[in-house]
């Protein structure tokens, strides 16, 4: 499974244009849940599912052996980590070089990795995300993972004037790749809104605004929370857009 994913995964560089023609023909069902990403994806096993990985573009898998953020959880529960390790030179070393030569700052860039047929074989447990439970073999399922890093606003002194334009372009590339690869379901969420301190209101508004142009059957914003999601920025953004 890992060899197959590595053989078929690819990177889309910032400068690559993959615009998808806009022709809205599908009624999209939107869901906001408190689930974790793979927990949400499991409900659609058997469909072509894209899951957004809220990545760190310098460290492979974030800190998968001890931290408990979304990317680390994805890596511990699936075959994703060795696939990302295979992109060490083209993706991670590239970004180290760009940072060290000051060709890239905290805003990062639009590079992303598409990893198909990642096998999820452990439960994405909210009670103890560092030690997920092995699932029975018949419960395993596959997802397609899009690895893309949000701006690291936790180290920014102020928001640049083009902040929303950058976020919009990056989200559009994520959605374009998911659509081009014929995903029926996409699992999104509070991308970059944790440690990277991007504002949920902006991320939610731009996701919802752009998603109206795509033909996904189901979009689920999995917010990994025990709180009531009805008051979340994502629910409010959907209500404002009447979708």
Tell me the role of every PLM-derived stretch.
Residues 1-243:
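Macrodomain-like recognition of ADP-ribose-binding/processing modules
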């Amino acid at each position: 499974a890992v060899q197959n994913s590595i053989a078929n995964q690819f990177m889309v560089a910032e400068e690559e244009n993959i615009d998808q023609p806009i022709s809205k023909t599908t009624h999209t069902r939107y869901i906001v849940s408190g689930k974790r990403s793979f927990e949400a994806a499991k409900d659609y096993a058997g469909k072509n599912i894209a899951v957004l990985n809220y990545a760190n573009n310098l460290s492979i898998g974030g800190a998968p052996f001890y931290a408990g953020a979304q990317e680390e959880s994805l890596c511990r529960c699936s075959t994703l980590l060795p696939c990302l390790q295979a992109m060490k030179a083209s993706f991670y070393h590239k970004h180290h070089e760009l940072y060290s030569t000051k060709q890239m700052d905290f805003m990062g860039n639009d590079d992303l990795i598409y990893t198909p047929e990642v096998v999820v074989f452990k439960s994405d447990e909210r009670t103890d995300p560092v030690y997920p439970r092995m699932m029975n073999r018949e419960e395993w399922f596959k997802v397609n993972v899009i690895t893309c890093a949000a701006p690291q606003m936790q180290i920014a002194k102020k928001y640049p004037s083009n902040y929303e334009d950058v976020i919009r372009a990056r989200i559009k590339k994520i959605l374009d790749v998911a659509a081009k690869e014929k995903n029926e379901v996409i699992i999104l969420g509070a991308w970059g809104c944790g440690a990277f301190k991007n504002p949920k209101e902006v991320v939610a508004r731009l996701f919802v605004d752009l998603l109206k142009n795509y033909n996904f059957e189901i979009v689920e914003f999995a917010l990994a929370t025990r709180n009531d999601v009805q008051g979340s920025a994502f629910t409010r953004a959907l209500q404002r857009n009447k979708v």
